[in-house]
Amino acid sequence: MNKIFYTDGACSGNPGPGGYAVVSLEENELVYSYVEDFQHTTNNRMELMAILHVMKLAADDKENDYLVYSDSAYAINSITNWIYGWARNGWMNSKKKQVENIDLMQEIYQYVKFPMSNFKLEKVHGHDGLLGNELADSLASKNKQKYLNLIKKHNIIDF
């Protein structure tokens, strides 16, 4: 079975208070929702943590395929392209500086160094009307009214 997740991260101030959200919909039912908040973080860190959250779910569930949609080009490029070079170069970037979010990158690398056959990551455009992405965005950014409006407009069954 395919499980589809939408992830998003948000931050006010960058760095500042922020959070990330993960949602999964099946037809018109919200079947999974997770939100975590932090007092001092960055938007990129939140985007990475949201994707890492689903990686952990996929690693523990070999019976299902996980498709993750994210609107973060930074997170997707970091995880699918740059991370391998960073690992080879001692977690230094092309400017010979330590990569940002090294702790998360090293944890993510433990999942991607041997590709997970049941995990796929795809880029979507943010704020483009894609329901799952909009729900994740509203939860990550603490926009409760937007979330409730989306639930009502699309007749989503919220658990």
Feature map (PLM): residue ranges:
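RNase H-like nuclease fold core
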Residues: M1-M46, K56-D61, I79, S138, ...
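RNase H catalytic domain
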Residues: A10-N14, H53-L135, L139, K144
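Short, conserved alpha-helix that lines the donor NDP-sugar binding/gating region
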Residues: E47, I51
